[in-house]
Amino acid sequence: MSSTKQWDISKALTVATLFYFFHNVGKFCLMPFLTLYFRQLGLGAPLVGIIFGFKHAVHLLWAPLCSFLAKNHHKQRFFIMTSLLLSAGVGSLFAYYPPLDKNIVSLFCNTSMPWKEQLNPPIDISVSVDENLNTTYAAPTDHQTTTGALNTLPSSVGKLATDPAMTSLDLEITTHQRFTDQFPVTSNTILEHQTKNVLGSGKAQKVMSSKSAASNSKQRSSLNNHTSPYATHPNVSHHPSIHERKVRDIGIDFTDNSLDPQHKIFLIVLVLVIIWEILAAPLEWIADDSLYEYLDFVDATDRHGKLWIWGYLGASMGSIFITFLVDNLNCFVIYDIPRVFFHFFCYGGFLIGTLFLSTLYPIHVSKKTEHSNKTVKALGFLGSDGRIVLTALTVFLLGAVGSTTQNFLFWQMQDVGSSELYMGLSIAVGLLSELTLYFFRNKLLKIFTFKWMVALGLFSLGVQCLYYSFLWAPWSVLAIQILNAFSSGVIWWAINSQVVDLASPGTERSLQLALRWLAYGCGSSTGSFASGFIISRFSLAVLYQACCITLLLWIIIFLLVQPKLPNTKKINYSRLLAADNSDMSDSDEEQDRDWLVTAMKDENSNRNW
């Protein structure tokens, strides 16, 4: 007797649910906070933007190609397990190389402490004040480096420098510190950063002593000869690159003057990130495709659309867990390990846990090649229909603007003295608000038409960007994150709904994946490249305001163009396969709910006889 293989759908979905959950816990322990690590390395906004731009570009090109190769050679499980193992290893490598400077880690860590503790930073800072109330700060001389995270306070007046000849002076400040959003590069081996005295602010603390006056009389002429290219705002500080120094021991010969240390650090990080993304990018794409094919084989694809919920729950839990852990650690734990490295350790740990689940992950080896044909057909369909073209441009803009939030929002929060816990909570609030609104999705789709749902989503994102440019306190970001339900949820529900109406039978999912690929690949890559240079030229606030204006202009264009495009729905007969037998009734009430009858009515109403 030949035994028939049993398909345990419940077990398969349970394993897939745990896989999605733990993978997203690990992913959100690190990925949203990677930008803070790059900032502690001393990389300026343009360099960070380039790194993220290449990261998205690699994902854009490599993930679908690797998925195709895995499917062709029936090696999906091998690719999934290899991706988990190697990406965990390469990600954890950042905790050891390139090394962080302890002084800089201390100063960035210092902003997360209560304000009273911020007054006593863990390193010695030399301070001098001249007769014009220009205050100068200097880092210890034994490291020969600037403290790039030293802050210009809202009430501070004066100049920031690193001259070792300056004398120490007690400094009493009653306002919290703020961090920079720009890292200008100079050619000095020991950098100086000066800020103009803001007279008449009413908040300046006058610090004078006979010792500082004597010291500054000797330093005044040399300091006045060095002017900063940046004029400081009372609420924004600008700092030099924290890696602009004589020597940085990272195993590279720094005697070569063709590149300054900051750019050498940048090249090392860029190469590591590209390798990391090559290893990590195929994971989600291959896992999602494999699970969908498995459920398609057992006629249970309707249950595939709910698994993202567990991914969101895992992401929310991961972001809160890691930030709560990091905020409750000292700046340096055992063996002087900076607490920021725990992001990498937790990322690697959860991915290793997910690796064990991948051995049971449901995968169906199909010999059909129609999947690749559907993907090619979906990509070709992007340019064949005016409505899809307009939708593609919209999601491209959505990805470009969204990347600015992912890359630099935490910089803006850090500038107002936010701890990492508020950052983690902001992620969780955004995801959970979207998840909550999902249960009212069908009602929204009935109330609003496609164009108004897209306009609502774009408008919500524009309001968020404008709000980000005026953050005044660490907690202030939490309220606006509720709009993520509209800027990320509603707009994609509307787009997916339209794709179902427009796509040819069997290509709906492929077209939806193509649009997300366009948004989070092309759009995010372009937005990352551009946003870093905008921040360098202007500021973070200007970047978010520009994003808001761009979104409002696109809303107007979208509302004007979309109604003029042909609006004839295609009858998707493949949907009849999913119809329940109870829908085949001959009663008038059941006929009204019959999908084919409804589609025929819609088609007749769109004809002009």
UniProtKB/Swiss-Prot annotation:
InterPro entries: MFS_assoc_dom, MFS_MFSD6, MFS_trans_sf
Location of the protein in the cell: Membrane
Region of interest (Disordered), residue spans: 201-241
Annotated transmembrane regions: 41-61, 78-98, 265-285, 307-327, 340-360, 388-408, 420-440, 452-472, 475-495, 513-535, 541-561
A Pfam family this chain is assigned to: MFS_1_like
Topology class, membrane: Multi-pass membrane protein
UniProt entry keywords in alphabetical sequence: Membrane, Transmembrane, Transmembrane helix
Bias type Polar residues, positions: 207-230
Superkingdom of the organism of origin: Eukaryota
GO terms under cellular component: membrane
UniProt similarity note: Belongs to the major facilitator superfamily. MFSD6 family.
Name this protein carries in UniProt: Major facilitator superfamily domain-containing protein 6-like protein A
Annotated source species: Xenopus laevis
Gene name tied to this protein: mfsd6l-a
